[in-house]
Amino acid sequence: MGELPKDDWQMNRWKWDGQRFEAIELQGESLQLSNKKGLDLNLPCGFNDVEGTPVDLTRPSKKVRSGSPGSGGGGGGNYPKCQVDNCKEDLSIAKDYHRRHKVCEVHSKATKALVGKQMQRFCQQCSRFHLLSEFDEGKRSCRRRLDGHNRRRRKTQPDAITSQVVALENRDNTSNNTNMDVMALLTALVCAQGRNEATTNGSPGVPQREQLLQILNKIKALPLPMNLTSKLNNIGILARKNPEQPSPMNPQNSMNGASSPSTMDLLAALSASLGSSAPEAIAFLSQGGFGNKESNDRTKLTSSDHSATTSLEKKTLEFPSFGGGERTSSTNHSPSQYSDSRGQDTRSSLSLQLFTSSPEEESRPKVASSTKYYSSASSNPVEDRSPSSSPVMQELFPLHTSPETRRYNNYKDTSTSPRTSCLPLELFGASNRGATANPNYNVLRHQSGYASSGSDYSPPSLNSNAQERTGKISFKLFEKDPSQLPNTLRTEIFRWLSSFPSDMESFIRPGCVILSVYVAMSASAWEQLEENLLQRVRSLVQDSEFWSNSRFLVNAGRQLASHKHGRIRLSKSWRTLNLPELITVSPLAVVAGEETALIVRGRNLTNDGMRLRCAHMGNYASMEVTGREHRLTKVDELNVSSFQVQSASSVSLGRCFIELENGLRGDNFPLIIANATICKELNRLEEEFHPKDVIEEQIQNLDRPRSREEVLCFLNELGWLFQRKWTSDIHGEPDFSLPRFKFLLVCSVERDYCSLIRTVLDMMVERNLGKDGLLNKESLDMLADIQLLNRAIKRRNTKMAETLIHYSVNPSTRNFIFLPSIAGPGDITPLHLAASTSSSDDMIDALTNDPQEIGLSCWNTLVDATGQTPFSYAAMRDNHSYNTLVARKLADKRNGQISLNIENGIDQIGLSKRLSSELKRSCNTCASVALKYQRKVSGSRRLFPTPIIHSMLAVATVCVCVCVFMHAFPMVRQGSHFSWGGLDYGSI
């Protein structure tokens, strides 16, 4: 072990080249990326930006923790001080333990101390402060650590199996040579599964391959014990998915004197399941178990229906179906065919385990991987076996599953193949392999979205299934400083990733050396790295002297591996309950050099120990949180009132990462750096991260919306392209590929980003321009495939169409790419498409105003596959105004004049739109007012009081009666009859 450095290195003394992975020591200079660095954020929300503060969930062991002195708080030059409020104890001369954890000796032993305006106590095992409520009275360790300690004392250690084997051997000293052979075979199995480093005195030596073959020859004829046969039968019945199927093994056969299945059959299934390293042994097992006549006679179960069968081709072999469901071989198959199909089926749907699998076997495609997690019995990430991981226990007592497991279960329920419902058989507490026993499971994971990766570029949707997935790999190098990193570090990491990365960018920060590498790879490459991390770390150590002599941690997604003194340990399952999750950062794009306010939204952002940083130009800068908000929708908000990115390049394009971490665990979000116009366009994407009509239940759902993953993929790809704008391609990785340009161009057109599409086209032309000043054939074929101009016409985006039509590869040569006459499928051109689209007068005007006047001259002559011209398309769709517009332009061109279409002194089209919008607003206003008054009237129920209505009715009745009486001819005693017609007029 090397000597510990005297002082932890400081950020302002080093300049890190994130592209070359090289460190340059500065002389009297300081590299500042932000106006906020080295901040000690003692906020109530739990932020404390002290780089040396340990996080118990990320360190695999107390012995693997950093031995270097504590940093000065994120790169500052001050010596560390005690983090207790009002404690000014200088820790520069204190012990290394107190310097690392920022606590003086007095407060580390005190029963209570005021930290962050809260009374807390220093935990001796966590090496951090907790609230007093987390401690039992008088205890120096928190209850969580004490519970783990008690569980470790009661838990059986992994070496107990070897001890039991030795005890069994010592106890049965009178056993015959056959039992000794069995013990030797079990010892070989244990050693083959990664436990050969822990040999116990007195245990039998590991037999060689020839000895194993001899042992198999001896014990292949041994019958299985009756109790083991019944146990296999019972587990097979429990694992069967269809309960109506008959039992594969009749228990009455044993009572009738039928011979039990041969031990050879069990070993054959075992070898097929575990993947024997000896090809001769596999051939021997398959031939001896299924091709040999004597073995078949011993294996065949007694049946009255087949007692007369003597031919080997007619023999019916029956074996209990451990995967659920009885399976009987067909009598029409030859022995060799049956053996091949039987072995293939066994390897794909049978997982017969004696012990937990070796980590080396996890990379085999036909062997399932065992579950690794942080053991409650140890702080080291080791491979543990838990009773709850048994498939039978999971079948009876299902636990809370992750979204990926739920997707797999849904897929498994809809499958009709009996092989997908297999259940592994565990004889000695083997860990769960059910998740990977299904051969379609890996295919399902690659088709699911996170990786976040994939696209068929089918318009108009923004799909990202085939795109590169951007992820982060973190290394923590103990007892190192930047000067000790080799110059070949980038090459070693690139080769370690099997040359899969399309892009890589690195950042470093103190805490020994925390090296963060952002990598763009395919989803399948990420899956291989996470599933085979142990083998990958082993290959990294073997191929590099620097890594073999280093003590380090590596975090790749869901797994954490550690290397110390040549030993590699792996933890596959982390406790993800309190992991931070960044949903979005607002704004999504910023202008370099301009100060802006930043809002970070996500989940679990205010937990204890979280740190907010900005990664840019190879280094980290701490960010000061000025406000926080914890909503009822489980979405937290962190506010950064003053955020500024300083660009070291004159080019205003780039990308940085906003990181929220707790040790090596955390989440990140890309932040685009561009000019003001592009930033304004990209910031419109925030609506897709915060839909206004999303209800609380949807926000709380752990499955994030698909659109978020698609937009995130778009931002990551755009960030990689912008980063290459100011970095030279001298590192050996391939240039930005055409499929990646294809994805960005389609997304930009579908989102109506005119400024962004021009910038992306400039970068594509710059990389694919030939010596003759023209684009190469591959680029032209790609542009013809995605048909950007047709997409703009479908969206009726006239501004985007004008941008594309006037775009030239070289302005001096006027070499235009997007012509209005370029033919697509069926010889359909943009002119035909626009002519058949309604309300596209502006689009027709733009297409016929191209710089070369191709659209105007081809309107009446350009035909498609059916012989129709754009003029015919417009006439068939009753778009006669299009033909009138083109005819007027042609007449003006012939006469050398310019005509203006003025109707009633104003633009009729614009007027109709404005009037319709105003009328619509007026109608809406009137409707709302009418509804308001209607509600008021309906609330009072009567317009007038009841007495007034009665009086009016009485007066009206009297008036009607008088009028009727006067209009009739009543009989009067004196005088003539009165009639209305006899009345005259005159003065009164």
From Swiss-Prot:
Molecular function terms, GO-annotated: DNA-binding transcription factor activity; transcription cis-regulatory region binding; zinc ion binding
Binding site for Zn(2+) 1: 82, 87, 104, 107
Zinc finger (SBP-type): 79-156
Renumbered ranges of motif Bipartite nuclear localization signal: 139-155
Cofactor binding notes: Binds 2 Zn(2+) ions per subunit.
Compositionally biased region (Polar residues): 250-262, 301-311, 327-358
Signal peptide: none
Gly residues: compositionally biased ranges: 69-78
Classification via Gene3D superfamilies: Ankyrin repeat-containing domain (1.25.40.20), Transcription factor, SBP-box domain (4.10.1100.10)
Region: Disordered, residue numbers: 52-79, 240-262, 289-416
Biased amino acid composition, Low complexity: 368-379
Names of required cofactors: Zn(2+)
GO CC terms, sorted: nucleus
Keyword terms: DNA-binding, Metal-binding, Nucleus, Transcription, Transcription regulation, Zinc, Zinc-finger
Main location: nucleus
Family matches, as PROSITE patterns: ZF_SBP
A Pfam entry, by short name: SBP
Family annotation (InterPro entries): Ankyrin_rpt-contain_sf (IPR036770), SBP-like (IPR044817), SBP_dom (IPR004333), SBP_sf (IPR036893)
Cell compartment(s), UniProt: Nucleus
One of the GO BP terms on file: regulation of DNA-templated transcription
Metal-binding listed as a keyword: yes
Binding residue positions for Zn(2+) 2: 123, 126, 130, 142
Function: Trans-acting factor that binds specifically to the consensus nucleotide sequence 5'-TNCGTACAA-3'.
PANTHER family membership: SQUAMOSA PROMOTER-BINDING-LIKE PROTEIN 16, SQUAMOSA PROMOTER-BINDING-LIKE PROTEIN 4
Protein's UniProt name: Squamosa promoter-binding-like protein 16
Organism per entry: Arabidopsis thaliana
Gene: SPL16
